[in-house]
Amino acid sequence: MPSVLIPLCVYLQQRKGQATGLAFIDATSLAVCHNRRIYSHKVFKKIAKRGKTSMGWFYGFKLHLIINERGELLAFRLTPGNVDDRRPVPELTRGLTGKLFGDKGYLSKRLFQTLFEEGLQLITPIRKNMHNRLLPLFDKLLLRKRALIETVNDQLKNISQIEHTRHRSVANFMVNLVAGLIAYTHQPLKPSLNLTNPQQALLNEPL
């Protein structure tokens, strides 16, 4: 493992944003080789796994992210590609309170209850076969803003270049990933929501 990786990880922790009571969660795939080369791929043979997203199958890892409404990174976790998006959530959200918005992949009564007991309300869309529920208008509006974190993931891949298939070692992959996340934290103009003071005050209301 390159000696630079540990200092980079420490620095990345220092670059995390401030919890504001509003957060968005998502997971994005990090493919390490083309699907046709899975069986001949050796670098990540023992740790990468096949996973599936809305775009199809991939071989590699998942990067799980939580951001605030300013586009700042609050938490991150790397897992093999076959890990359920919900599994890392309790650890990722440790210390966070307020509202957490995610897609349908985070639907889970057990997860909702676990987070609610910690002071964090998980808000997701519902499936077509589920009974409709009443949400405050502000929460419905924020639920439609989940694209914010998708934009962050897009910038991480296309600007910070955290995903490519030319890695020669696991250590090189990790350094590239951490350095890319750090580079993103230094972007002066991050994707963000422009909330008014009254809207911000709604986030501070008790659950």
PLM feature spans:
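Short alpha-helical elements
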Residues: 1-207
